[in-house]
């Protein structure tokens, strides 16, 4: 019974997240000092990130497993890796960051370049990862 309620709750959460998220990114160009960085993650980068974070999930480094067993288009880029890339750009601003919140929105396949965008909005730094299909996969907010 408890498992059924948890499964139901997770399904509702996924549906509400999907409804809130648009495949088209909001404009970031209106943010002060916005920066865009293109990253081309490859299987070696994902394997190394898996190793240093002790993440043994095969969707990050075993292409046949990711495609055949899990049904993904390719290897998936780690959520925390995306958050780390956003944080790297945010800290490069030189502004004193007090806190960070991030949220994964959708899977990011590693075989295509993706963009990391960061910009300032009042007392926040807003960051996100945008896939080659123009879909936001990760968003972050930094309090300054």
Model-derived segments and spans:
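HotDog/MaoC-like acyl-thioester-processing domains
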Residues: 1-41, 108-110, 117-144
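Tryptophan-centered motif/residue detector
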Residues: 1-3, 54, 65, 81, ...
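Residue-level detector of solvent-exposed, low-hydrophobicity positions
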Residues: 4-9, 54-56, 61, 68, ...
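Hot-dog-fold acyl-thioester-processing enzymes
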Residues: 29-93
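Hydrophobic beta-strand-centered segment that forms part of the acyl-chain substrate-binding groove
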Residues: 70-73, 77-126, 132, 139-141
């Amino acid at each position: 019974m408890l498992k059924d309620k948890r499964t139901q709750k997770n399904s509702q959460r996924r549906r509400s997240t999907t409804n809130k998220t648009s495949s088209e990114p909001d404009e970031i160009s209106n943010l002060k000092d916005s920066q865009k960085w293109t990253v081309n993650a490859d299987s070696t980068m994902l394997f190394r990130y898996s190793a240093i974070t002790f993440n043994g999930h095969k969707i990050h480094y075993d292409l046949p497993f990711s495609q055949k067993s899990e049904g993904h288009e390719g290897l998936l880029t780690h959520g925390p890796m995306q958050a780390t890339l956003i944080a790297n750009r945010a800290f490069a601003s030189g502004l004193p960051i007090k806190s960070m919140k991030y949220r994964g929105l959708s899977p990011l396949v590693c075989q295509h370049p993706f963009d990391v965008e960061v910009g300032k909005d009042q007392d926040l730094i807003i960051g996100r990862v945008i896939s080659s299909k123009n879909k936001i996969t990760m968003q972050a907010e930094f309090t300054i």
